[in-house]
Amino acid sequence: MSILLAEITGNIASAFGLLGAAIGVGLIGQKAAEAVGRNPGASGKILVQAIIGMALAEGLGILALFLAK
């Protein structure tokens, strides 16, 4: 019974970690699109910063997945 409980707890923890990463990536994309809309000339710099932010958010999500399993 305790093994099943540990598996369920790990799955829930990894789901919350990945949910947070998905929300973070979505917010970064939203704000990057807004920033490009306000200042189209800086789209190159905004894109680079957005990709770095998305990579960090996804990295934390993957870390949560591995730590929970």
Predicted feature residues:
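Hydrophobic, small-residue-rich transmembrane alpha-helices and their short perimembrane loops
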Residues: M1-K69
